[in-house]
């Protein structure tokens, strides 16, 4: 009996030893995987896009997809058609609706177009509108009307999406049954961002995770969820918004709101060690407004009257001197905030951008990569 017991004991010891070895192999494999995951996590640059609503953050994300992922597939382009049609509908509804509410109100150039306005206001505003051919006909004819054009020119007096003119100019293409949106159409298309969206891409074998968060006031409470382990903040401001007010608060100037928001982020105690890359966006629209001369920057920012173009200003060939002065004034308004309360732990790096211009964003992002790399090394105390 003792011999049998002894053999069973040896077998049991052998099984136990194998189990222990197997558990150790599994444990070692888990440890190696965790170590690998940690290395990948630490090697990833996490970029947080912040800024007020309609500043161009989501357009920056689209550019990263075009430049560093695979752009947009045919099915994704087709899916955007409904959003683009909605942009056209929102634009013509808003403009024709504003004609009678402006002070002084604006009349149609052709009184016979009133029936077209009535159609747009009565039928196109419905929730189940299906964009019949007459909608496009009415929209095209109204967009040619001088009264509608004058109302568009006063769009800073009401809320109108930036892409209104772009898509209203292209109704004849978009209404075609075989229409497929171009990259520029997708970049221009406006869709409200609600929540947090992550885009992952790789540049020269370096991993980037970019987080886009809604910029409207009621969306900003979600920002705190993204602050952990951020490599850098990209703050986006719409420079062309100097003569506009917020959708959510018609008493607040949009550019001043952006400056206030930048100040709150810059002075946030949780972000004191995170540097900010400042995208002074919508330079194309800013230049249009300044050159048109109808909305003077000094009417909204009295300090501009005394402002002189700084010595470090870089001028592009043929650039209007007043446009140069305006864009550097806005830059310096932000830098005044960062230099007033900077403690040497984080820095502000300004760049002039046009988010719908792929070459511009490619050049700017390449310029930023060295900055982001330094921030990443400092984040893990390697610099």
Swiss-Prot record:
Comp. bias intervals (Polar residues): 8-17
GO molecular function: G protein-coupled receptor binding; G-protein beta/gamma-subunit complex binding; GTP binding; GTPase activity; metal ion binding
Domain G-alpha, chain residue ranges per copy: 43-383
Annotated segments matching region G4 motif: 277-284
Residues covered by region (Disordered): 1-31
N-palmitoyl glycine: lipidated positions: 2
GO terms (BP aspect): adenylate cyclase-activating dopamine receptor signaling pathway; sensory perception of chemical stimulus; sensory perception of smell
Biased composition regions of type Basic and acidic residues, renumbered to the chain: 18-31
Database matches in InterPro entries: Gprotein_alpha_S (IPR000367), Gprotein_alpha_su (IPR001019), GproteinA_insert (IPR011025), P-loop_NTPase (IPR027417)
Family note: Belongs to the G-alpha family. G(s) subfamily.
Subunit structure: G proteins are composed of 3 units; alpha, beta and gamma. The alpha chain contains the guanine nucleotide binding site.
Functional summary from the UniProt entry: Guanine nucleotide-binding proteins (G proteins) are involved as modulators or transducers in various transmembrane signaling systems. The G(s) protein is involved in hormonal regulation of adenylate cyclase: it activates the cyclase. Participates in olfactory signal transduction.
UniProt-recorded name of the protein: Guanine nucleotide-binding protein G(s) subunit alpha
Gene that encodes it: G-s-alpha-60A
């Amino acid at each position: 009996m003792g011999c049998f017991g002894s053999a069973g004991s040896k077998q049991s010891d052998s099984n136990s030893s194998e189990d222990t070895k197997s558990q150790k192999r599994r444990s070692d494999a888990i440890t190696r995987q965790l170590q690998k995951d940690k290395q990948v996590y630490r090697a990833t640059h996490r970029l947080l896009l912040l800024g007020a609503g309609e500043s161009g953050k989501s357009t920056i994300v689209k550019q990263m997809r075009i430049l560093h992922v695979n752009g947009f597939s045919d099915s994704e382009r087709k899916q955007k058609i409904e959003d683009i049609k909605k942009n056209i509908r929102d634009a013509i509804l808003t403009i024709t609706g504003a004609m009678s509410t402006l002070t002084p109100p604006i009349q149609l150039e052709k009184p016979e177009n009133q029936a077209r306005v009535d159609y747009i206001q009565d039928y196109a505003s419905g929730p189940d509108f299906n964009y019949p051919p007459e909608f496009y006909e009415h929209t095209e004819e109204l967009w040619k009307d001088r009264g509608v054009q004058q109302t568009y020119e006063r769009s800073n007096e009401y809320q109108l999406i930036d892409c209104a003119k772009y898509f209203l100019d292209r109704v004849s293409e978009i209404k075609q049954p075989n229409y497929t949106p171009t990259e520029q159409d997708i970049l221009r298309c406006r869709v409200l961002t609600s929540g947090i969206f992550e885009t992952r891409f790789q540049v020269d074998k370096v991993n980037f995770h970019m987080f886009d968060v809604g910029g409207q006031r009621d969306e900003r409470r979600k920002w705190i969820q993204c602050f952990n382990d951020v490599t850098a903040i990209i703050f986006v401001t719409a420079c062309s918004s100097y003569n506009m007010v917020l959708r959510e608060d018609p008493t607040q100037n949009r550019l001043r709101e952006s400056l206030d928001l930048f100040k709150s982020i810059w002075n946030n105690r949780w972000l004191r060690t995170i540097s900010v890359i400042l995208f002074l966006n919508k330079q194309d629209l800013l230049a249009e407004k300044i050159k048109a001369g109808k909305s003077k920057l000094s009417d909204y920012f009295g300090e501009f009257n005394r402002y002189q173009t700084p010595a470090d200003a870089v001028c592009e060939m043929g650039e209007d001197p007043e446009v140069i002065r305006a864009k550097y004034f806005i830059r310096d308004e932000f830098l005044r905030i960062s230099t007033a309360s900077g403690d040497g732990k984080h820095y502000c790096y300004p760049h002039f951008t046009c988010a719908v211009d792929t070459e511009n964003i490619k050049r700017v992002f390449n310029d930023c990569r060295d900055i982001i790399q330094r921030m990443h090394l400092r984040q893990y105390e390697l610099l």
